């Protein structure tokens, strides 16, 4: 009888470890997807910045800016004026089988800030957030790059 009890506890332990492994794998997938999405946005900005003059560079970087206000995954402000950036940001919220979107991500959980001041060195910061139904607070991925 005790042997059966010990066996059952062992089986339940193995099932619990399997569930934990699946959860960790899902978390890793979302972190990887978030890193890839922020990298895609940074690459787009690097490739499409107009570097012909300093004024043109500043203007194009400013056009990439998206919801520069707010903090902690509750962003606000004007949307980006660049259609390519908006298309990439839309991929973040497009969730479904075979789609790269992040669960719980909305338009208000994405931000691109640009600092074109002399002290900012054309710093671009891209933040995207997502939240699983089991998460108490949103998770985020932030990538910082400089455009010269």
Question: For each predicted feature, which ranges?
Answer:
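N-terminal single-pass transmembrane signal-anchor helix
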Residues: 1-18
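Flexible, low-complexity segments enriched in proline/glycine/serine and punctuated by aromatic residues
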Residues: 2, 23-148
